[in-house]
């Protein structure tokens, strides 16, 4: 099985309505390019630009059952293509940073909210938002077959536990909406993460010149060794440039599954009985 993943590396337009319309157009372009899954960058509803005053923040947020999100559910069914739509979600006591994954039938497979919010003690950080409290993995039905998918959002990448938890829940592919500079070290994180837990990671970022973003959406397939190769291979099978665009990359799921069955990374030699300190707080 091979899946085509569309990275909607787009510049937001401004208003919710304009972003919705531009997102719809991009999804049609993704379908024209043969995509099975389309992923947006982080918090597409507002372009990851949100007010910090409480009343304005609440006004900016949208419901996961409201017209903005519902339109992309309908579009997923219309296009026979899974869509991972991102938005500032209405929630109590505070809004959340959320991605909803709809399958090709328009059914919501999960609604995941960012677990590790960017609370850096800065005026423009995410301290005004609520954090999510779990990671989800679902069986996503595509026209090519079923694949187990989960999501993490931007800063979640910085914590190895995020991807590890979803690997232990059976994930084969992680969809990662993003809004930050994807420079050498952050890209290296993804290289390492895909290698150490043997899964694919698809990250969609905003293009330049969006504030503090530089494109470089990527797909890592997680397959480091092949029997016919004398040495390791590069797991980065796609990297966009800085510019805006709808980019499509292919993931060889059968190759990944065969590799996971053959190799020893990931789960095989884990010893969770000695990892207890990992789930405790503030040891540094």
Task: Please provide the spans of the model-predicted regions.
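A short, polar/charged loop-to-alpha-helix boundary motif
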Residues: 114-128, 243-259
């Amino acid at each position: 099985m091979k899946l085509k993943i569309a990275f909607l590396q787009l510049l937001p337009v401004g208003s919710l309505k304009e972003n919705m319309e531009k997102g719809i157009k991009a999804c049609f372009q993704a379908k024209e390019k043969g995509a099975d899954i389309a992923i947006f960058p982080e918090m597409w509803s507002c372009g990851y630009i949100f007010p910090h005053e409480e009343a304005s923040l609440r006004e900016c947020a949208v419901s996961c059952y409201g017209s903005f999100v519902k339109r992309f559910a309908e579009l997923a069914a219309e296009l026979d293509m899974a869509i991972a739509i991102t938005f500032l979600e209405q929630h109590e006591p505070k809004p959340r940073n959320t991605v909803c994954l709809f399958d090709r039938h328009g059914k919501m497979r999960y609604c995941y909210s960012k677990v590790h919010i960017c609370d850096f003690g800065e005026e423009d950080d995410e301290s005004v938002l609520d954090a999510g409290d779990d990671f989800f993995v679902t069986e996503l039905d595509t026209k090519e077959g079923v694949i187990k998918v989960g999501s993490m959002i931007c800063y979640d990448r910085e914590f190895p536990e995020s991807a590890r938890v979803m690997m232990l829940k059976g994930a084969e592919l992680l969809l990662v909406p993003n809004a930050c500079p994807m420079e050498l070290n952050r890209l290296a994180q993804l290289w390492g993460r895909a290698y150490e837990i043997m899964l694919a990671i698809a990250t969609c970022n905003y293009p330049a010149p969006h504030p503090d973003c530089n494109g470089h959406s990527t797909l890592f397939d997680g397959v480091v060794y092949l029997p016919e190769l004398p040495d390791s291979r590069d797991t980065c099978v796609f990297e966009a440039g800085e510019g805006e665009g709808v980019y499509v990359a292919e993931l060889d799921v059968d190759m990944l599954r065969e590799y996971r069955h053959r190799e020893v990374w990931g789960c095989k030699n884990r010893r969770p009985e000695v990892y207890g300190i990992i789930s405790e707080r503030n040891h540094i």
